[in-house]
Amino acid sequence: LAFLAHAVANVAVEKPEVHFLVIGAGPSEQEMEQIFTQAGVADRLHMTGVLQQQALIDALHAMDIFAFASCSETQGIVLTEAMAAGLPVVALDASGVREVVQHERNGLLIQEHTTAAFTGALKQITAATAQQRETLKQGAKATAEEHAMSRSAAKALQCFRALAEHQPGTPKGERDWEDALAWVKAEWDILRSMAEAGTAAVGSTLFATSEE
């Protein structure tokens, strides 16, 4: 998180319109405050604490850019949540990220994991024209739709239904089949709940916004 805070602070020093909104809570809060204080832009760091439901949605829609510096996002859920709000993403190239972020279509994917590279990407996206930003915004929304949890869960449910329609064979096969069906039912219940919810918790995540 300090890595990201340094990058955003670097941009904030040069661009007085840039603010950094942090959603969530964790042990890095004091370090981030120190980074922004030392850079002379402490007044542009905003920490909301943990937000849920409508408050989280409102915060996402108040932003212009989603800055993501984690290399451990295995499923890309956090990224698609941000993209659903029309936010282009600036993120490090990593597993789970590169499957979602498409360079210059819905954000910027940074190959070099350095503060300088991340700072440069943030400067690039904040300097984008209105048309370029609109293109990224629409690309983000399209990606969120493609990765919608409800759609993914529905596809999985279709597979389970197709599996359940088959009949068992031998007695041993029947026992194996009963075990398989028990597993399918458990997974089915989980996926159906996910499909009905259609959302995922974001948790402690950093968001950067450039206010116009």
Predicted segments, located by residue:
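Conserved acidic donor-binding segment of nucleotide-sugar-dependent glycosyltransferases
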Residues: 103-104, 108-115, 124-130
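Short hydrophobic beta-strand element within catalytic cores of glycosyltransferases
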Residues: 88-91
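A short, well-ordered alpha-helix in the C-terminal region of glycosyltransferases
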Residues: 131-146, 158
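A conserved mid-protein helix/loop that constitutes part of the nucleotide-sugar donor-binding site
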Residues: 1-10, 20, 27-33, 116
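C-terminal amphipathic helix plus adjacent low-complexity
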Residues: 150-212
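Aromatic "clamp/platform" in nucleotide-sugar-dependent glycosyltransferases that forms part
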Residues: 71
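Short alpha-helical donor nucleotide-sugar binding micro-motif in glycosyltransferases
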Residues: 50-51, 58-63
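Nucleotide-activated donor-binding/catalytic signature segment of Leloir-type glycosyltransferases, i.e.
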Residues: 31-51
